[in-house]
Amino acid sequence: MSEVVHKYRVLIVASHPVQYAAPLFRLMSKHPQLDIQVAYCSLQGVKAGFDAGFGIEVAWDIPLLDGYPWVQIENNSPKPKLGSFFGLINLGLWNLIRKDKFDAVIFYTGYNCLSFWIAAIAVKLKFNKLLFSTDASVLEPRDQKRWKIWLKKMLLPRIFQLADIVMVTSTLGKQMIHSLGIAEQNIALTPYTVDNDRWISEANQVDVKAVRKQWNIPENATVLLFCAKLQHWKRPDDVLRAFAQADVHNSYLVFAGEGPLRAELELETDSLGLTDRVKFLGFVNQSHLSSMYRSADLFILSSDYEPFGLVVNEAMLCGCPVIVSDRVGSRYDLVKHGETGYVYPCGNIEALAKIIQEVLPDHECLQKVGTAAIKRMESWSPHEYIKAVIKALEISTSRI
C-alpha cells in the first residue's frame, strides 16, 4: 500500500513578479506535496516601468507569470509604488486569507508595506501559519546610518517573532536573524537560487566568438565582467581603477548595466586612456545574460551593500569564476577563496587589482575555478530550496 503524501495548501503573497522567483513558483506548483496560489500586490516588471536604479524603463523579456497559479490583488493605494509603505494597500488580501483554507501563508513582500500588515493580521486571526522570507544578511543599512541600526535592533525582533518560521536565504542571514533573539528552530535556511537548469543550458549554447565580435573584443583576449546597476554602493569605479592598476596584457573590461554613474565612469575611462579596452553595454535583459557570463573570463561584484547577490549564482552556473567583495552575502555559502572564486576586502583597490593581475592571465586557473563553481552550484539549487520550504511547512504545521 503506497504511503499517502500530505499536500500543503499554501498562499504566497508577493509584492510583484520577479525573474528569480517565477521559476521557483513553477517548480513548486508541480511538486506533489504543494498546492500553491501566488497573490501579487503589483504586476510591475511584467509591464514596462521606470526602474530608478537603472534610470530607464525596464520590462523583463522572460515569462514571469506562466506555469503556476496566480492572482493579482487590487492595489487600493492612492499613490501606487513599490518600496513605499503606503504604496501597496491591497485590501483584498484580507478576504482571500480569511475565506480560503490555507495551511500556511508565505510572505515575499518585506515588512515595509501596509499590505504585509493587512495580510499578517488576517493570518493570525485565522490561526494559519505565517512564514516570512527575507534575504537580509546584515543589520547595517545601505546608507550606514546608525539610528537605522538602532531602530532595526529594536523593531526587527518583534516583527520576526510574528512568524512561525523565518525563511532566510543564506548562512549569514541565519546568523543575523538568530542574533535578534529568534530561536534557531524557528529559522529555516532556504537557499537563494536561480533557475540552475536554464542558466547551464543557455550557457552551453553560447557562441563566444560571435559575442566577442559584437563587443569588438578579440577572441584570444581575457575579459573582466561587471554586471550590475551602475550605482554608488555597487562600486563600479573600484573595478575600473583596479583594472587599470592591474594592467593585464590583452585584457578588456565590460560593464553591463545602466545607472547614474555611467557618465562619470565613461569620463574616468577616457582620462585613464582605456577607451579602447573598456566597453559599456548598457542595460542587458535576462535572455542575453548567459551569453555575457559565458563570454567573459572573470566576473566581479564589488558592492559595499549586497544582501546576497544572485548574479554570483548566474556567473558560477555559466562557468565564469567570480571575485566578490567581503560585503557580498553569497560569499559565505558559494565563494571559497581560491577554489570556487575569490574574496577581497571591500574598497581595497590594491587587493582587487592583485587578484585580477594574478588570475586573469592564468587560463588554466580560470578553467579550474570555473569548473569548481559549476560543481558547487549542484547543491545550491531550486530543488534544495523546495525541500527546505517543505521542511519549514512540516515543522510549522505540526505545532499546535
Can you say where each PLM-predicted feature lies in the sequence?
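Nucleotide-sugar donor phosphate/pyrophosphate-binding loop at the beta->alpha transition
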Residues: 114, 129-131, 138-162
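Donor nucleotide-sugar binding/catalytic pocket of nucleotide-sugar-dependent glycosyltransferases
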Residues: 149, 153-210
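A short, well-ordered alpha-helix in the C-terminal region of glycosyltransferases
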Residues: 213, 277, 351, 358, ...
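Conserved donor-binding/catalytic core segment of Leloir-type glycosyltransferases
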Residues: 218-234, 240-243, 254
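Short alpha-helical donor nucleotide-sugar binding micro-motif in glycosyltransferases
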Residues: 283-284, 291-296
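Aromatic "clamp/platform" in nucleotide-sugar-dependent glycosyltransferases that forms part
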Residues: 304
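Short hydrophobic beta-strand element within catalytic cores of glycosyltransferases
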Residues: 321-325
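Conserved acidic donor-binding segment of nucleotide-sugar-dependent glycosyltransferases
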Residues: 336-338, 342-349, 358-363
